[in-house]
């Protein structure tokens, strides 16, 4: 015989309610919040070494400002991040500040899901428009209103293995890679490196894979060098110059055909091969620098090679935005601007991650200039090839993925450059005819 | 509800009882809490969604202008919508068949195993208790990875389980079957245990073999359960989203994107709530058709059996 358990229905109901209450209040009060602190909620997508450095900067800010508590939330990069920001902004109870990609600004409905930046408050914390790289500051506006505070630019760069390049006789007397101009010099350099590697492809980049954007990044570094553009200023006309676009694509195919680049590496494999000195060159964004240093690869970095004229390189920029809030607490708002100003003014610390500060005073700081190899490619900040300012562009956008998918088979030879360009143009036309969720004028 | 007027003090006991009975018969007061929640969280959003599907509203709630059937016209001309609808149908067929047959097979097995029944029950039903995120991440990161995954390691193969467009859907189905077959198994097991034992005894006396008993007693007695399981399974499979979103994100090359993910993509990631609502209503109509067809089928069967 067993006694029935001594729990009445009322006990159970009461107990569950108490538990629910405890759970709800547990959600509302984050650990570490002192009662007198102002809480600033900050969302970002910075992972790996970027994330570690950002976390350190947030910690340093907290030490200098004991009255402010920064609640740092790291979310998954890419589409899921922009989905969450939009949802938070739509609800009007969003984080106080968020990291964002500049090229995404035109697509998020600035003014509806994002709140404008208050220039007076920005001046109060010591930031002036003239402090920022002019083309980037310009792009931080949408319909004439400032919606973003620029933080950095992260251009395509060229990583090179110093040991392998030395063996191939490619380094100058200063130990740096001898810069190349035009197709022939670059091909010559790659052929020499190929010999040292025993015939293995000397160059790797993200060339293949699901949703790969690497081929887009390479193409949009090469093509703008000859002055090529994608869209007219207002985004209404395709302005692709077929000849220039095909020149860039044929060059990419030539790299694959001659075995100078490896068309079968996806993002991870390209970084792994360069890390293990199985390739002499890596074309990638500037953010791999910390990881490569940690893993002890003998490497340095320089600007993306100039092949078709200028030294342009595909880039996007990290910026800070204020997702829309229905009621912004003035005290929290002030603390938010303080926090943004702290991060921007300490851009030299951030540059350790590889990114080029868009805050111009930071570019002159001895701390930054001493960073090797992160300061080697700083001059690119005036040559960045940013996405056209239309709603379907930006990091991890449909445009990048469509163009990446169109050009990936060109490198491996499964598709001719002409077919690749036709596929890209068809995708661009599809994107242009798709309805903009935030039309410029109410129709 | 007209009988709920306050009864005068002179009411006879008989009348009082009558008032009480009809009051509890309606029971409206008791279901009001449920009805309020049902209306607020199901009926109202459903109607709101229908209205949204005729507008171009975005995620910020602006651009809310009436566009008539433009969203539906766009959806019917949208190859990615058709592709995702097709994927949902393929998944439904590929998953429902093994989920029903395997559920029955496992139930028969456990029903006839005479030792450690609790262990078999637990093993087959256990996975069903796991949340979708746990299941998806376990398969994504431990079983399917091409280089170090359990599956390729065991088979000694080099297969891109989730990366090959022609295989990805099968892999998703395999995971889903492992995860959810336990529910059908449990329903079948309960049904098996409620088949009266004397039928089998009588059959044994008549000299029926095990196969005869299965074919002529067990399967017919399970008919209603099978019908129920098929309905539940079809509806569950048509609503597939979690495991695909978590394991493949709809890829590779859109080979696994179900229609619900497409609605999510165009609505929450693409910010076009109006268009997403139209896509959702296309699925809604499909589910209503399946349910109606099922109802008709049931009614016919019930008439035949009576």
Q: Which functions belong to the PLM regions below?
A:
Chain A
Residues 45, 57-58, 217-221, 225-226, ...:
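Extracytoplasmic/periplasmic substrate-binding proteins
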Residues 288-296, 309-405, 436-443:
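C-terminal lobe and pocket-closing loops
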Residues 47-69, 403:
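Short, polar/charged alpha-helical segment
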Residues 63, 122, 140-214, 225-264, ...:
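Helix-loop-helix "hinge/cap" segment bordering the ligand-binding cleft or interdomain interface
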Residues 3-5, 11-29:
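N-terminal export signals
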Residues 60-132, 141, 167-169, 273, ...:
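Extracytoplasmic "Venus flytrap"/periplasmic binding protein-like
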Residues 101-157, 214-215, 298-302, 370, ...:
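Hinge/lid segment of periplasmic solute-binding proteins
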Residues 36-47, 68-73, 97:
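Short, well-ordered beta-strand elements
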């Amino acid at each position: 015989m067993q006694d029935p358990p001594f729990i009445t229905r009322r006990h159970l109901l009461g107990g569950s309610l108490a538990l629910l209450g405890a759970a709800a209040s547990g959600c509302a009060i984050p650990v570490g919040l002192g009662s007198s602190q102002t809480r600033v909620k900050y969302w970002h997508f910075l992972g790996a070494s970027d994330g570690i450095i950002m976390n350190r900067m947030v910690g340093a800010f907290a030490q200098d400002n004991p009255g402010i508590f920064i609640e740092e939330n790291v979310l998954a990069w890419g589409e899921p991040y922009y989905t969450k920001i939009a949802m938070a902004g739509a609800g009007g109870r969003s984080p106080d500040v968020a990291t964002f990609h500049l090229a995404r600004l035109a697509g998020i409905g600035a003014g509806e899901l994002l709140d404008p930046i208050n220039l007076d408050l920005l001046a109060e914390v010591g930031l002036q428009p003239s402090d920022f790289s002019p083309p980037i500051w310009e792009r931080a506006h949408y319909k004439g209103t400032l919606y973003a505070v620029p933080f950095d630019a992260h251009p395509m760069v060229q990583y090179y293995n110093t040991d392998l390049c030395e063996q191939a006789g490619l380094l100058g007397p200063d130990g740096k890679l001898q810069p190349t101009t035009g197709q022939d010099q670059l091909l010559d350099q790659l052929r020499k490196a190929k010999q040292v590697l025993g015939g293995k492809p000397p160059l790797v980049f993200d060339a293949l894979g699901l949703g790969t954007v690497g081929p887009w990044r390479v193409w949009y570094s090469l093509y703008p060098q000859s002055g090529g553009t994608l869209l007219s200023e207002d985004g209404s006309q395709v302005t692709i110059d077929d000849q220039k676009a095909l020149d860039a694509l044929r060059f990419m195919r030539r790299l694959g055909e001659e075995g100078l680049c490896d068309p079968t590496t996806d993002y991870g494999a390209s970084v792994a091969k360069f890390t293990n000195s199985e390739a002499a060159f890596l074309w990638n964004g500037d953010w791999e620098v910390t990881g490569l240093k940690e893993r002890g690869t003998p490497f340095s970095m320089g600007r993306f090679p100039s092949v078709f004229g200028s030294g342009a390189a595909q880039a996007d920029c990290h910026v800070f935005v204020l997702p829309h809030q229905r009621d912004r607490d003035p005290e929290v708002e002030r603390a938010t601007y303080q926090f943004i100003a702290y991060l921007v003014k300490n851009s030299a610390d951030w540059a350790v991650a590889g990114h080029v500060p868009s805050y111009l005073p930071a570019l002159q700081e001895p701390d930054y200039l001493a960073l090797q190899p992160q300061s080697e490619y700083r001059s690119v900040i005036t040559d960045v090839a940013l996405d056209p300012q239309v709603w379907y562009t930006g990091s991890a956008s449909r445009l990048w993925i469509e163009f990446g998918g169109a050009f990936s088979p060109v490198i491996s030879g499964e598709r001719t450059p002409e077919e690749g360009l036709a596929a890209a143009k068809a995708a661009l036309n599809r994107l242009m005819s798709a309805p903009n969720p935030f039309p410029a004028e109410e129709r | 509800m007209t009988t709920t007027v306050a009864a005068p003090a002179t009411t006879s006991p008989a009348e009082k009882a009558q008032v009480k009975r009809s009051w509890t018969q309606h029971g409206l007061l008791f279901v009001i809490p449920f009805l309020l929640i049902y209306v607020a969280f199901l009926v109202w959003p459903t109607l709101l969604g229908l209205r949204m599907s005729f507008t171009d509203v975005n995620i910020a709630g602006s651009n809310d202008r009436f566009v008539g059937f433009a969203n539906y016209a766009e959806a019917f001309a949208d190859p990615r919508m058709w592709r995702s609808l097709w994927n949902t149908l393929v998944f439904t067929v590929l998953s429902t068949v093994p989920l029903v047959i395997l559920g029955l097979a496992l139930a028969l097995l456990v029903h006839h195993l005479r030792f450690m029944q609790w262990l078999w029950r637990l093993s087959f039903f256990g996975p069903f208790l796991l949340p979708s995120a746990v299941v998806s991440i376990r398969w994504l990161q431990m079983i399917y990875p091409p280089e170090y995954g359990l599956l390729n390691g065991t088979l000694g193969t080099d297969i891109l389980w989730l990366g090959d467009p022609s295989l990805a859907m099968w892999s998703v189905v395999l995971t889903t079957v492992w995860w959810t077959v336990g529910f059908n198994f449990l329903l079948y097991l309960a049904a098996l245990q409620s088949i009266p034992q004397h039928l089998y005894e009588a059959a044994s006396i008549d000299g029926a073999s095990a196969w005869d008993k299965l074919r002529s007693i067990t399967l017919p007695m399970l008919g209603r359960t099978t019908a129920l399981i098929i309905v539940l399974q079809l509806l569950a499979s048509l609503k597939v989203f979690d495991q695909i979103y978590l394991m493949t994100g709809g890829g590779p090359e859109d080979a696994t994107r179900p229609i619900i993910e497409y609605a999510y993509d165009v609505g929450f990631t693409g910010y076009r709530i109006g268009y997403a609502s139209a896509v959702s209503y296309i699925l809604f109509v499909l589910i209503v058709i399946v349910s109606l067809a099922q109802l008709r089928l049931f009614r016919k069967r019930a008439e035949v059996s009576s």
